[in-house]
């Protein structure tokens, strides 16, 4: 059946260039196809201004609202190191919760409505360890389902004293040698954070250049759940970098002017994060996951769970997706996108797409 004759009541509609594009208001049906939406224009409407967010290109459901502790939870965690080499230690807290009382874990806790994610990690470190800290960089984002997100930060101690008196937040805090953690010499609540410790060691050793903006959550309210795909292809010799963008992005100079240059999807809580990635890969490129690795890192996050009464506690995440070097450049399924070359080293670094550049890791649980 031709695309233009699909029944919008019973089917999700995949609009391509040349067809009328439905408004980005809600999902039209119960199928599993991706709905491709407006790209800056409506019939008779004026093109969007630069630096304004686009209406998302694709849609998989829609959140009526996003509110912390109602339908979404954010967790803030800290990795804090001291010493070097074989003497490197990590700061852990002894859990006070009944389910894991007495076991050791990284400082972490739920973000409360009315505070930023950065404020939350500073508060948790103070309550659980006794130390004041400076939040240096986002190390990792972990996502479970579509309503649970854990932000792990690299932090530095700025003051305070090691906690020794137990309370409801923690029983104590202590420094442990990383080698002892890996050798199972410490009774841990869980071992999932050890890879974050490794990432922190790598970050401290090969941290970002000072002139490059840190990847920290931007304090902007987001009315929904959004995912941006920065699909990057590096040549085998590392001399050429290409990225998939909207056709309105004529060349790399436009990247710096556009708020949202990459393919973007809005999704609802009924779609798990990994499922959204899989569906969008298949929709964007002929070979999908056969030619592009699973998103491995994040390069931008917008999230602001305040004020408390807001219904826009959602999140917008830009993910780094690396095209396989062994594969030919993927055929684009939608005519609204194209590949552009990014030749400027400064632009590559600004967008965190340079090959050896630090990027916070992404783990889909």
Swiss-Prot record:
Which cofactor does the UniProt annotation name?
Mg(2+); Mn(2+)
Question: Gene behind this chain?
Answer: ndx-1
Organism the protein comes from = Caenorhabditis elegans
Q: Where is the Nudix hydrolase domain?
A: 72-201
Q: Which residues form a coiled coil?
A: none
Q: What does this protein do?
A: Probably mediates the hydrolysis of some nucleoside diphosphate derivatives.
The record, for SUPFAM superfamilies, names:
Nudix (SSF55811)
**Which parts of the sequence form the motif Nudix box?**
109-130
Q: Which residues form each disulfide bond in the chain?
A: none
Query: This chain belongs to which protein, by name?
Result: Putative nudix hydrolase 1
Give the Enzyme Commission number: 3.6.1.-
One term under GO cellular component: sarcoplasmic reticulum
Keyword NADP among record annotations: no
Ranked from the top, the taxonomy reads:
Eukaryota, Metazoa, Ecdysozoa, Nematoda, Chromadorea
Gene3D superfamilies for the chain: Nucleoside Triphosphate Pyrophosphohydrolase
């Amino acid at each position: 059946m031709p695309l233009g004759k699909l029944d919008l009541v019973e089917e999700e509609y995949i609009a391509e260039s040349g067809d009328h594009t439905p408004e980005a208001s809600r999902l039209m049906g119960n199928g599993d196809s991706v709905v491709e939406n407006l790209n800056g224009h409506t019939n008779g409407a004026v093109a969007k201004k630069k630096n304004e967010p686009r209406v998302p290109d694709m849609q998989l459901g829609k959140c009526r609202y996003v509110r912390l502790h109602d339908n979404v939870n954010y967790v803030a965690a800290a990795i804090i190191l001291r010493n070097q080499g074989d003497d490197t230690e990590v700061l852990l807290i002894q859990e006070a919760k009944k389910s894991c009382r007495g076991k050791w874990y990284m400082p972490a806790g739920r973000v409360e409505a009315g505070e930023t994610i950065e404020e939350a990690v500073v508060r948790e470190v103070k309550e659980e360890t006794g130390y004041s800290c400076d939040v240096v960089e986002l190390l990792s984002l972990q996502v479970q389902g579509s309503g649970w997100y854990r932000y792990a930060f690299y932090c530095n101690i700025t003051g305070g004293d090691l906690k020794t008196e137990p309370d409801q937040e923690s029983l104590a805090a202590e420094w442990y040698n990383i080698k002892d953690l890996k050798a199972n010499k410490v009774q841990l609540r869980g071992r999932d954070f050890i890879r974050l410790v490794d990432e922190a060691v790598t970050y401290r050793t090969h941290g970002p250049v000072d002139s490059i903006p840190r990847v920290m959550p931007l304090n902007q309210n987001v009315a929904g759940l959004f995912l941006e795909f920065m699909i990057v292809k590096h040549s085998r010799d590392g001399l050429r970098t290409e990225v998939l963008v909207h056709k309105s992005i004529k060349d790399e100079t436009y990247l710096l002017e556009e708020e949202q240059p990459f393919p973007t999807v809005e999704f609802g809580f009924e779609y798990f994060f990994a499922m959204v990635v899989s569906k969008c890969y298949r929709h964007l490129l002929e070979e999908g996951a056969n030619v592009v690795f699973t998103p491995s890192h994040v390069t931008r996050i917008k999230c602001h769970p305040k004020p408390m009464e807001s219904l826009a506690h959602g999140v917008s995440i830009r993910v780094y997706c690396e095209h396989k070097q062994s594969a030919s450049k993927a055929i684009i399924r939608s005519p609204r996108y194209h590949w552009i070359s990014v030749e400027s080293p400064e632009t590559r670094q600004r967008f965190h797409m340079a090959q050896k550049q630090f990027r916070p890791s992404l783990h889909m649980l």
